[in-house]
Amino acid sequence: MPIPTQSQIGGEQQTAQAIADSVSTQMRVAMPGIIQSFDPDTVTCTVEVALRGIVGDGSTELKPLVDVPVIFPRGGGCTLTFPVKEGDECLLIFADRCIDFWWQSGGVQETVDPRQHDLSDAFAIVGPQSQAQKISGISTSAAQLRTDDGAAFVEVAAGHNITVKTPGQLTATAEGGTTITSPTITLNGNVTINGNLSQGMGESGGTATMLGPVTVTNDVKAGGKSLIQHTHGGVQNGSGNTTAPN
């Protein structure tokens, strides 16, 4: 008996839908993940997929993804890095084709496997935030490099002001020297200098004003005259004055 046309069409539609569902189920594009471990030497991580997979009519937990390359902002010989720890949230993105040879050798490579949009070809971008893990106090007027709690930050404001703040210690090391050019420099706090202190400005020098008191442990020289070792001529008893220091 011939099969009715409507039944044929229905069967074709069901077949096409089944194929589409199968392709959709196997195709990976992007999904959230949770870092389980990070290897700073290989710059890769192990990631738990944060969404369940679909198998048949039910859902199942996907196995952790291993050797996932971590993406740090990088270019022109400079890289922005930050700690990656267990529990950090990330976005997993999946390459169109197999990345094995590229990951091992860089450059332009052949695809060793015909797989596409596969779980094996993931990259991890650390930073997406669920509502359970989001930070607060985000500045709406400046760019900040900050700790999650906001206690320490480097800020570049739209008005050109730059601010550095930390409850901890600020350390700077410059082996090639340090130059600061500013109309005024204000230091609020005690200052300790481990090294020599000199004043430039050519032969005329510059002025120095201090409220004092000033305590000097060793000698002081003014105009080449030693405060400790200088002598005076014309010394005599009485109310007369000595001559200028030698």
Name every feature range the model reports, one short phrase each:
Residues P2-E175:
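Hydrophobic packing positions characteristic
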